[in-house]
């Protein structure tokens, strides 16, 4: 039996809070400030394991990906697989992997938008399109913390956090509270998070040294209605392999 367990996970906004703390230490990017909070998401992810609570489906599953205009800034879209992922088949696996990578790409885009001061699309209704239910309260707390920190920090950041070497490190089957399960419904996506282009309001690099890049892992959960959602991020280590 294989079980996923993500301890000491950080939402994207926790990374912003950490960055704000680092940049506020008299210009010392290696300051000792810590994120205001972290979220912990534990998920049993095998066909025979018990599951933590998830939201019940509110709409019927749709195998087709939503057709929407390319989102920008803090805009949030629902992410579904482009093919039916209910079957245990190669095409379903590839569709789930692609959906999980889209979740991570959206997470990175939202992180940059929030760092730039764009909080337009942060209502509960909009966040629910993207955030795993157990992670919602933490994301909301971190958004408010980021609002406060940006105000106290003298303005928003410029530049973007970038991603590279994106790959799926685990693909598991999640058993839902009603006893049903879907293959490829719990995924972990690992990548290199690069902060080297991010600048503070005064134009200085926000993070320098070994902490300017980090290897992180994002948990992605498929809900019963077919949506793939962000369920938390954990930092594996400072620096990246490449």
How should each PLM-predicted stretch be described?
Residues 35-67:
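Extracellular mucin-like PTS domains
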Residues 74-158:
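Core segments of small alpha/beta cavity-forming domains
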Residues 14-18:
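Hydrophobic helical h-region of N-terminal Sec-dependent signal peptides
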Residues 20-24:
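C-terminal motif of bacterial Sec signal peptides marking the signal peptidase cleavage site
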Residues 2-13:
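Bacterial N-terminal signal peptides that target proteins for export
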Residues 119-242:
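Structured, amphipathic secondary-structure segments that form assembly/contact surfaces
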Residues 26-29:
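Bacterial signal peptide processing site
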